[in-house]
Amino acid sequence: MARRALKLASLAAAASGIYLYGNKFMDPNDFGVVRVGRAIATTAVITYDYLTSLRNVPYGSEEYDFLKSQVHLRSAERLRELCCANRGTFIKVGQHLGALDYLLPEEYTRTLKVLHSQAPQSTRQEIEQVIREDLGKEIKELFVSFEDTPLGAASLAQVHKAVLQDGRTVAVKIQHPKVQAQSSKDIFLMEVLLLVVKQIFPDFEFMWLVEEAKKNLPLELDFLNEGRNAEKVAQMLKNFEFLKVPRIYWELSTRRVLLMEFMEGGQVNDKAYMEKNGIDVNEISRNLGKLYSEMIFVNGFVHCDPHPGNVLVKKCPDSGKAYIILLDHGLYQVLSESFRMDYCRLWLALIKADMKRVQKYSRRLGAGDLYPLFACMLTARSWESVNRGIDQSPVSASEDVEIRSNAAAYLPQITQLLNNVPRQMLLLLKTNDLLRGIESALHTRASASSFLNMSRCCIRAVSTYQRSKSHSLYRRVHISLTEALSLWQINLYELFLWLKGSRLGSWVIAFLSRMHHST
C-alpha cells in the first residue's frame, strides 16, 4: 500500500508537470518546479505517514488513538510549513482549515491557527510597483505620509496607514503582487493532489475545499467587489448604531488597491483591552451575535471572515459608547431564500429541542441519516445537550473536551457531510466556529440572550417570508399576530432572565421563599 502511494504521488508529479508545461499553464519564473515539488513532497510524506504509522495497530485501541493523534500533529505541522513556504493561496486555505474548530481534529486546527499571524509581507518596492501600475502615480504624489510597516498583513494583501494630500487619514489595502497570477495555478495543483490522495484513501472527502476556493478566491482578489460589499452591509445594518464600517474612497481604489477610512481599536477577542478601556465584554458579545443573526437569518448576506483581526472594538471618549468595527469585506456568502428558510427553521427547532423538526430540516439541508452529527456540528454541543435543549445549560469543560475528541473520531462522517450539504453551508460553518472562538476567548459562550436574539431573527425572517407568499389578507394578519405574540413571549422570558440575575430579582425570590416557608 505504501509503495502504491509513492507510485501514485510520483505519477501525479510527472503528470502535473507535463500537463502544466505542455499547456503553458505555468510560468516557471513565478511558479517553478521547487514550488510544485514542495507541495507534492509534503503530500507524499503525509500520506506515507498515515499509511505506515497505523498499519499494524488495532483500530480503536488506546495505542491507535495515541498514534493517530501524533500523526495528525506531524501532518498538521508539515502542512503549516508548506503553507508558509508557498504563501498566497496556500496560507488562505490553511487559515480556512484552522478556523474549522469542532469539525477537524484539534491537532490540525490548533497548529494551523498560527497562520493568521504568519502571513507574508510585500516589500516597499513591491508595494510601490502595485500602486504605480494601478493608480498611475508614485506614493509621494498621492500621500503626505505613508507608513512602511503595515498595520496588518494577510495571505492576499497587507494594509498601510497613510495621509492623503488633503489631510484625510486612510487605510490603504494593497494586494501582494504575485497572488493574482499564482492563485488559479495553486488551486489546480491542490485539486490534482487531493484527487491522488482520494485514490489512496477513498474516505478522504476534501474536494469541497478546492471547490470553495475556486468560487471565492476570485471574489476576494477583486477589491472593488470588497468595497461594494462594505457599502452594502453598512446600508443593510444602518439601524445598529454600535456598528462602524469604514467608508470607501472610490476615486483611489482599483481591483488591487483599496482606500478606506482609517479606523482603529482593540481586537474583539482581547478581553484585557476591553477591561482596560471600560468596555462591557457581555455587551460586545451580545451585539456581535445580533449583527450575525441579522445578516444570516434576516438578510441572507453574511460576512464570512470574522476572525479577531477583522472585528475591532473601541469606546468613544465623548459618548462612552462601545463600537464594533467590521473590516475586510472580501468574503460574503449570499444565501438563497429556500436555504435561509430551512436554516431558520432548523435553528428554531434546535433551540426548542424539537427533534422531529431537527431531523426534517437537517435532511432538507443535505445531512441525510447523519442529522444528529450535523446538529452537533452546527451547535458545537453534544447530542445529549441538543436533545435536552441547547439553551438549557452552558457548555461545560467536559462537554467541550468530548466534542473536540469526537471531531477526530468522526472525521470520515464529517467530511462526508461537508461534501453533501449545500455549498452555502460551508462558509456558515466556518463563520459559526470563528464566532464561537471569540465567545470562548471572552468567556461569554452560548448565553441565553444569544439564543433569544437568534430566535427573534428567525421568527421575523420566517414571518416575512410567509407574508410574502400569502395572497389572503386574513392569512397575513394571522401571521403578523402570531409573530407579535412569539416576539412578546421572548421579551417576557428575557425580562424573567434579567430579573433572575438582578439584585431586585434575587430579593423578590428570597421574599417569596420566606413567605412560602412562613405559611
Swiss-Prot record:
Disulfide bonds: none annotated. It is found in: Mitochondrion. One of its GO terms (biological process) is mitochondrion organization. Its main location: mitochondrion. The active site is at D305. Appears to be essential for maintaining mitochondrial cristae formation and mitochondrial function by acting via YME1L1 in a kinase-independent manner to regulate essential mitochondrial structural proteins OPA1 and IMMT. The action of this enzyme is not yet clear. It is not known if it has protein kinase activity and what type of substrate it would phosphorylate (Ser, Thr or Tyr). GO terms for molecular function: ATP binding; protein serine/threonine kinase activity. Keywords: ATP-binding, Kinase, Mitochondrion, Nucleotide-binding, Serine/threonine-protein kinase, Transferase, Transit peptide. Pfam families: ABC1. Residues 145-481 form the Protein kinase domain. Belongs to the protein kinase superfamily. ADCK protein kinase family. This is AarF domain-containing protein kinase 1. ATP binds at L151, G152, A153, A154, S155, L156, A157, Q158, V159, K173. It is an enzyme of class 2 (transferase). GO terms for cellular component: mitochondrial inner membrane. Its EC number is 2.7.-.-.
